[in-house]
Amino acid sequence: MKCGTRSLAVLGALALSAMGLVPAAWAADAGQSGAVEASQSGAAQTEGTQAQSGAAQPEEPTQPAHSSAPETSAQSGEASPGLVDTPIPDIQAVGAGDDSAMVGATVTTLGVVTAAYPAAESGLGATLDGYTIQTPGSGGAWDEGRASSDALFVYAGKNGQVPAIGTCVRVTGTVGEFPATTAKENPQSLTQLAATSVSNVEGCQAVTPTPVTGVPTPDQAEPYESMLLAPQGTWTITDNYQTNQYGTLALTPGESPLRAATDVVAPGAAARDYEAANAARVIALDDGTNTNLLNGAATEAAYAYLANGSPARVGYHVSFAGPVVLEPRHGSFVFQPTSMVAGHPDRSPVTITGQRPSAPAVGGDTRVATFNVLNYFSDLGVDEAGCKGYPDRTGAFVTAKKCKVRGAFSREAFANQEAKIVSAINALGADVVALEEIENPVAVGVGMDRDASLARLVEALNKAAGSGTWAYVPSPQIVPEAEDVIRVAFIYKSATVAPVGESLIDDDPAFTGLARQPLAQEFARVTAERSAPASFVVIANHFKSKGSVPEGAGEGNVDNGDGQGNANAIRVAQAQALASFAARFSDKPTLLVGDFNSYSQEDPIKALETAGWAHVSGAGEASYVYSGRSGSLDHVFANAAAKPLLAGVTSWAVNAQESIAFEYSRAGMNAHLAIEADNPYRSSDHNPELIGLTLSGGGEPAPTPSTNPSTDPSEAPSPAPASSQAPSPAPQRGLSQGTTASTRTTPSRQTRTPSNLARTGTDADRAVGLGVLLAAAGGGLLLVARRVRRRG
C-alpha cells in the first residue's frame, strides 16, 4: 500500500469484518492513511557480497496430479450445516512426525473459506491452486492447550473451482501431506485435502482470527496450522533478499532487525545460543504464490511488498491491517496472506513504514571513508570473447558470469553501476575514500595499466562534482608480483588533502593468493599556505572471505560451526600481518579501514585489538546484511596517536538494508520496478563507514604533500623501465618502504587512455557459516529455506 491511498486492501478488510473474519477494529484502522514504504534485486549471495541475478532457486514441488478436477455443486438451500463425516481437527490430528494420522483416507468435512488462491491468477504459473477452510465458529483467543488445528488447506488442482472467501463449503477428498511426509524429515509439511467434490452450505458461524504477538514455536504452530491469525503490534523487516524473487519478507517482532551472532557475542557456544534465539524470532510473510518472480510472465507482475518510492528496507516497521494464515511452505511456517498479493499489491495485509537515511555527519575538519564498491570493473563482459552473463527479462546480459572480468556485462549496466557509486561517493562528504573491489586490469589480464579503472571512476566523479574535485593515489612503483583481480585504492579531494610521498603495499605472504594486499598512504591537510598542522596515515584492507577454504589451507580454516565461517585462521594471520606492517607508522595518527570479512567479536578483530588497535566503529551499526542478520564486516581501527583526533565514526545505511532489486545487477528484471540509477541507494552490497578527524587543533607541521595529484586519466608521470624486478626507489618523504615479497615495477603512465568499459565481480566465495551455526544450535522454526546464496 502507498502513503495516503485507500487501497483495495481497505475494502477487503471491511468485507472480511462483515463476514466475521477480522476484528472490527481492523476495518476501522484500514481506512486510516499511513506512510508506507517498501524495496528489492536478485541473484545468489554470500557473506560480504551479493551474487548475480538469474541463479536458479528451488521451486515448491508440484502438487499431486488428480484424474479430474473436484466436482462443484451449489446446493445453497440448506438451512443448517448438518452432520459431517469428519471434523477438521480429527483430520489434522498427527500420527508419524507431523503428518496427519489419516493420510490416504477419503473424508468429508465442513469449513468456512478463509483464504483463496485460484490457479494461474494474474498469469502466474506456480500458484497455490486451492483454498483454506476453518471450522465454523472457531478461532479467537490463543489456546496453549490446543491439540489439533481447526483449519485445512484444500487442493483444488489447476482446473478446480476456488470458492470465495467467506463461503461455507462441504468438501470430500483424500487426505495427504505436501510435501509427501515429515515422518523422517525435520521440515514441516502441509496437511491438505485433495478435493473430489465441493458443495456450498448455508448457516455456518463466522471464523474469528486468533491474535498473536510473536512467532509461534514449532510445537505451538502445528496445532494452529492453516488457521487464521491476527499478528499484533510492531514487526520489523529483518531480511528482504527474496522479496523480488519469491515475494517474501522475513519479519521479527519488535522494532529492530536481528543481529549477526558473532557481531554481538563471542564465537562458539554463545554464538550458537544467540543464533538459536534469532531463529525462533523470525517468520516469512509470503505473497500467496510459489512463483519465481524472476522468470517468464511473472516479471510482468508487480511485487507484493516492493515498489519505487516504497523500498521495504531491512529495519522498516510492519503492522498488520488484515489477517494471515499460518501454514508451512518450503519447510517452514509462514504468514500467508488470504489472497495472492503478487501482481496485486493493493491486497497486502501489511502497512510498511520507514525512511531512507541521508549521509550522516561525523564532525571534524577532515573526513575519511571506506567503501566496498561491489566489483567496479571498467572492462566489460561484452568485450571479452566467450563471456556470458546473467540476463534480464528480455534476455539481455546484465552482469558477467564466470568470466575473466566481473561486474557489469554491458555498457548500459556499467553506466547504471557507475552512476549509483558516483552518487554515493559524492554524497558522503569525505575528503579521503579507501575503496575495495576496484578492478586490477593487470591481474585480470586485460591491460597493463593497474590504475585504469580507478582513473575511470575519478573521471566520472569529477564529471558529476566538478573538474579537479577528485584525484586518485597512483600505484607505487613497486607492486606485488601476485595480486587479485580486485584491489584496494585511494581517492581524495585535492582541495582539502594531498598524499605525502608514495603509497606502500603490504606484500606479506599471509595475503598472497588469498586476499587483497593492504595499501598504506599518508595524507596531509591542505590549507591556504599549502600546509597543515598534522598528517595522518590510512591503510585500506580487504581480508579473505568466509565462503571457501583454499586448497592446502591449514588447520582452523574449515567452518566448525562457531559462527566465524570458513578461512578464519587465514583472516587471523592476515590481521597479525597487518598489525606488524602498521606498527611502522606508530608515530603518526593511523587508521586501519576496510572490509575485514569478520564480524565484531570474531578472532581477526580481536587479534587487532590485542595488538593495540582501538576498534572505533560505531557499536550496533551494520555494514552488511546476510540471511536476515545485520552486522558489520567493515571496520575502523585507530592507533593511540589517532584516537585524540577522532570527532566521530559512523556507517551510512545506504546499501546493505536495501533490497537487491535496486542494485544495477537487477535492472530490467521486473516491468514495474526501476533500479533508480539516479540515487545512491543500493550502489553496493556494503555500507560505507565514515570517520571524522580534527586536524586543525595543533600537532607538528605535516610533511609537504605531493604536488602532482592524479586528477585525470591523461595526467601521469613518464614511463618507467619495463623491468619485472625494479630496484627500490630512492627514499622519499612520506611512508618508508618495507620489505616486500615478490614484486614488480608498475608501468608508469604518461598518456592514459580511458579503458574500454568492462567488468565487475566481487569476492566470489564470500559466505557465512550461518547454516552450520543453525545446525549446531538445533535450528529454529522459521528460517526460510528457499534460498541458496552463492557468489558466482
Annotate each predicted stretch with a short phrase.
Residues A24, N756, G769-G792:
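C-terminal membrane-anchoring or membrane-association module
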Residues G77-T399, Q417-E418, P509-F511, Q517, ...:
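Extended non-catalytic accessory segments flanking core domains
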Residues C3-A15, L770-G771:
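Sec-dependent N-terminal signal peptides
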Residues Q161, T248-L249, N292-N295, P337-P701, ...:
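Divalent cation-coordinating acidic motifs and surrounding scaffolds
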Residues G697-T762:
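C-terminal low-complexity, Ser/Thr- and acidic/Pro-rich disordered "stalk" regions positioned immediately N-terminal
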Residues A18-W26:
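C-terminal segment of classical bacterial N-terminal signal peptides
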Residues A25-A30, A35:
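Boundary at the C-terminal end of the N-terminal hydrophobic targeting segment
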Residues M19, G111, G173, V324, ...:
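Small-residue hotspots
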